[in-house]
Amino acid sequence: MSMEESIIRIPPYHYIHVLDQNSNVSRVEVGPKTYIRQDNERILFAPVRMLTVPPRHYCMVANPVARDAQGTVLFDVTGQVRLRHADLEIRLAQDPFPLFPGEVLEKDITPLQVVLPNTALHLKALLDFEDKNGQKVVAGDEWLFEGPGTYIPQKEVEVIEIIQATVIKQNQALRLRARKECLDRDGKERVTGEEWLVRSVGAYLPAVFEEVLDVVDAVILTEKTALHLRARQNFRDVRGVTRRTGEEWLVTVQDTEAHVPDVYEEVMGVVSVTTLGPHNYCVILDPVGPDGKNQLGQKLVFKGEQSFFLQPGEKLERGIQNVYVLSEQQGLLLRALQPLEEGEGKEKVSHQAGDHWLIRGPLEYVPPAKVEVVEERQAIPLDENEGIYVQDVKTGRVRAVIGSTYMLTQDEVLWEKELPPGVEELLNKGQDPLADRGEKETSKTPKLSTPRNKTRVVSYRVPHNAAVQVYDYREKKARVVFGPELVLLGPEEQFTVLSLSAGRPKRPHARRTLCLLLGPDFFTDVITIETADHARLQLQLAYNWHFELSDRKDPQETAKLFSVPDFVGDACKAIASRVRGAVASVTFDDFHKNSARIIRTAVFGFETQETKGPDTMALPQPRDRAVFPQNGLVVSSVDVQSVEPVDQRTRDALQRSVQLAIEIATNSQEAAAKHEAQRLEQEARGRLERQKILDQSEAEKARRELLELEALSTAVESTGTAKAEAESRAEAARIEGEGAVLQAKLKAEALAIETEAELERVKKVRELELLYARAQLELEVSKAQQLAEVEVKKFKQMTEALGPSTIRDMAVAGPEMQVKLLQSLGLKSTLITDGSTPINLFNTALGLLGLGAEAQPPAKKPTGGPSVQEGLLPISTAAPLTLGNNQVVP
């Protein structure tokens, strides 16, 4: 509907506001009505439904109209309704009503608040007013509107909050605090900040000045638990006992089954019952005396079957302990903390503070409060080969107890024997000195093993055919123990550690051991020698050795075994020195031919025999062993495992010489085999031709006999005139047969002569060819020897020109680099040859010993040609070719 219309129809229970523009006054027109608008009037809004407040509802109107005592609306002189500005009016259920100009619906129609049982509204007065009972209410007053009921709002009253009642269950209490001075539900006066408990079961609605802090649950107490409490301030508890600030006490099930801590009680915790069995005891520190106070510094011992609670301030020393039940092999070391007396009657014994004594089983023992158990001792079982070190604490003397079960006395303690770190490491390894002596240490870190019990007697099992030296520093003497035996060290005894050389070449202090093996055994060494013609060679020698003792019971004789700490290094150095001296006086060629003999004589030396030679002089004979008198070491044999040139050029020249000798021998054998095959072929062919001629002769002879028989038969058959003719014919046939036989015989003789001539010719041709081949081979051998001499002379002149120092520097630089290169490649043995050259490995040892062809059986000399050994050099004269580290091919 447009506001400019002149006729406005107002339905029932609707209203409009009309503004008189002349007087600027607004009024209300209520329907049902048809209102005709004047020209000076303006409709402010279309018809609006009146406000209808249903039952149990209310609304709030701001700036309400003023009414008189009869409820009539008041108007001012201008005709404008009079308003109560800045005021509020709460209107409850009534007939529909319009809003006058200036009135504002502050709060829409709202249901009245229903307050349920156990619920209250916390109200506060905003203005001073008088309630319906005529009592004056001052602004700021607070009170509760408790249910059940319906709360009628008032403009002077503000609803702060809704308060719910708190349900207090069994074994619960409600903790309250006063916000200001007031009276509680029981009528007791409470001051501001005071706290108290409400223990009554049920719903509790706090008063307006009561503040609910929390619900306190009761602590359920049993026979095994108690409640530890402490007073926050002076007060009287629920049982009427006066408590002081800081006082602590226990509440047990004998006092109450469920305890609700008061507001002045602080719960320190729940204490469990302490239960002792028949074999338990405990020591209580600072026990509570009859006056209820802790006796500081005192102790109390409880034993046996009982249960109790530790009072506040009491504590257990080391908790609940078991009664010491001692067997025959057990004991207790005790110490007196205070003077005390033990026993009864004549067995009464007094102890001063600090005394130590030992009690032995079997018994049950509970230490009194004045006695401290230092330790529980057990008898130490010892076998015949076991022992312990015991030290007397009074005298300080240490002794070893071996072979019997032993319990320490009160004045004895176990003594730890310290060993040098090297000895500890050797004992912890647990290696067999005989079986594991060849193992190399892959790492410097020792393997983790069980640490040695230092109180146990140190034992070491000496293997068979070995010896161990033990030195007593107290007696200042040594003893030697031969295996198999078990060595037990005394308190002042120590092992003699041997530091031996090992490796190839020998490195000093490479192996440490406690026992000395007596042999027989062997060790290997690598030495570098130089011949008279400055040829440097590397030898790998192996020596068999053992120790000789005339009397093992003689201390001086046995002490000689350990007089040389490193017998391996000492022997290797001595032998290497002898070998270098012997080889330095011979040339390379002589050493190559007689290397084994030279080395053996250098190592073992010579001795004079009774046998006299033709010149009436004693012939020196090589010894068969070398003896070191310092320690009785005997070297019984020496094995030359390898001989290898150090200089690369020497090695190459030797290799070429060996290859050339192999080629010459191969060519010679090939020519001899070819000649033998041709000779055998010619002989077979001659025998075949001769057999053919003999067969033809036999055939002709048979034919002649056949003809004779035919002639005889013809003569018998023919008679008469035919006899002469037959005889003539027979004679002619006979003559013809004889001629044929003679002709065949002559042919055979001619063929035989021709064959023999051919054989003679072929034989002479072959002999000439063989002589030619032999001369050619001899020329080649001579050429090779002359070339070798030229090479040797050239090498000698080059050596003299370069000088020993330059050659030594060159020789050291090259081989070391090549050896390192081969070692980095992981090669352990090397042989350089081609695929078509055979190598004889059967005569290696003979060629190594310098025997060569003398030790070989003589070869069968083939018929028709010279022997290979007559025209060629022996293979054994060639230089040895090293195969790996242990074999030499001559």
Curated annotation (Swiss-Prot):
There is a cross-link at K444 (Glycyl lysine isopeptide (Lys-Gly) (interchain with G-Cter in SUMO2)). It holds the Pfam family MVP_shoulder. InterPro entries: Band_7/SPFH_dom_sf, MVP, MVP_rep_dom, MVP_rep_sf, MVP_shoulder, Vault_2, Vault_2_sf, Vault_3. Phosphorylated on Tyr residues after EGF stimulation. Keywords: Cytoplasm, Isopeptide bond, Nucleus, Phosphoprotein, Repeat, Ribonucleoprotein, Ubl conjugation. Residues 425-455 are annotated as: Disordered. MVP repeats lie at residues 2-56, 57-111, 112-164, 165-217, 218-272, 273-323, 324-379, 380-457, 458-520. GO terms for cellular component: cytoplasm; nucleus; ribonucleoprotein complex. It is found in: Cytoplasm; Nucleus. It comes from the Eukaryota. Residues 434-444 have a biased composition (Basic and acidic residues). The vault ribonucleoprotein particle is a huge (400 A x 670 A) cage structure of 12.9 MDa. It consists of a dimer of half-vaults, with each half-vault comprising 39 identical major vault protein (MVP) chains, PARP4 and one or more vault RNAs (vRNAs). Interacts with TEP1. Interacts with PTEN and activated MAPK1. The phosphorylated protein interacts with the SH2 domains of PTPN11 and SRC. Interacts with APEX1. May interact with ZNF540. PANTHER family: MAJOR VAULT PROTEIN. MVP 3 mediates interaction with PTEN. Required for normal vault structure. Vaults are multi-subunit structures that may act as scaffolds for proteins involved in signal transduction. Vaults may also play a role in nucleo-cytoplasmic transport. Down-regulates IFNG-mediated STAT1 signaling and subsequent activation of JAK. Down-regulates SRC activity and signaling through MAP kinases. This is Major vault protein. It comes from Bos taurus (Bovine). The lineage of its organism: Eukaryota, Metazoa, Chordata, Craniata, Vertebrata.
